[in-house]
Amino acid sequence: MKRIQTFLLTLLLLTSCLSRVSTPEPTPTTAPVYTGTPTPFQPPTETVTPVVAQEPTATPLPRPARALILSIDGFRPDAIELTPMRNLGALMDEGAYSLVAQTIFPSSTLPSHSSMLTGLCPDKHGVNWNDYIPNKGYASGIDIFDLAHTAGLRTVMVVGKEKLRQVTEPESTDVFEFINDRDLVIAARVVELIPQGFDLMLVHFPTPDWMGHKYGWLSPEQYSVLFRADEALQIILNALEGAGMRDDTLIIITADHGGHNTTHGSRRLEDMTIPWIIAGPGVKHMVLSTDINTTDTAATVAWALGLPIQPDWDGRPVLEAFGLPDEPHIQPRCP
């Protein structure tokens, strides 16, 4: 079913491109230029056509050349105030953010990442398991990687948990790498991939979740690995800068869920509340007042890259981050 949806999406994109090619652009008219010379008297039998002043056009927003989503597994937003995360803080100062965004229920890694990238609530994408179970297949619906790959964009995923293979089909990623290691090791691999180019990349840091399960959320041990995650972020930002890609890359940093004690998955605020930070071309500096859900991540990336937002998506683009009026939610929030 999902392959049929992707095929129809390809036909839609091709039809849109052909219609744009076949329609000739109108020839612009040039208003007469005032030279400062007095206009001679015109006989009353001649008609003078008034020149209508044109309304000033709004400056178009700069569009990013690419988008990078960094998901920090198990990252509670209240940890930001308790952990020295200088690089994350710099992005917050540069861009827009919310520290009260919400994930979906169940607040677990695989269902949440599926909602993050498909823009759908769990009852639509169907991922209700949280382990790597290949025979269960993939999340249903057209996800952001399907859209990007169908449009001819280069798509990359570098993740620290193998179960994230089940978010999207293999043919929707040009590069998929599972690295069962620390965040700094994952970042080092991302640095090697950046010069090869990408249009859409997901990077997943697993270590904060591991430490939360072992030592507890907001434990000293988790603070320590969040500090390392910030160092890993710096490595990626430096690589983008070195490749001349930093200024035209849209960056979203978020999480799949939070946690309490040594667990998560419930509807408790500690489990459901996540950070949502965005920086890059066109993004204004502000604390976002918009009600943000993890499903909005896919819609925001699609909007920024000029990809078609799917009508059945529950998420919508966070336009407030770009200084624009937010669109109302057509779909209700996830139950």
Identify what each model region corresponds to:
Residues 7-16:
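Bacterial N-terminal signal peptides
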Residues 307-335:
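Polar, surface-exposed loop/tail segments
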Residues 63-64, 74-196, 303, 316-321:
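Active-site-proximal alpha/beta segments of enzymes that process anionic O-linked groups
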Residues 113, 117, 267-308, 319, ...:
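Substrate-binding rim/cap in mid-to-C-terminal beta-strand-loop elements of soluble/periplasmic
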Residues 68-69, 87, 225-268, 301:
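Metal-dependent active-site segment of extracytoplasmic phospho-/sulfohydrolases and closely related
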Residues 17-62, 329-335:
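Ser/Thr-rich, Proline-interspersed low-complexity disordered segments
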Residues 163-173, 195-231, 235:
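Active-site His/acidic residue clusters
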Residues 62-76, 90-92, 116, 148, ...:
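Beta-strand elements within well-structured catalytic alpha/beta cores of enzymes
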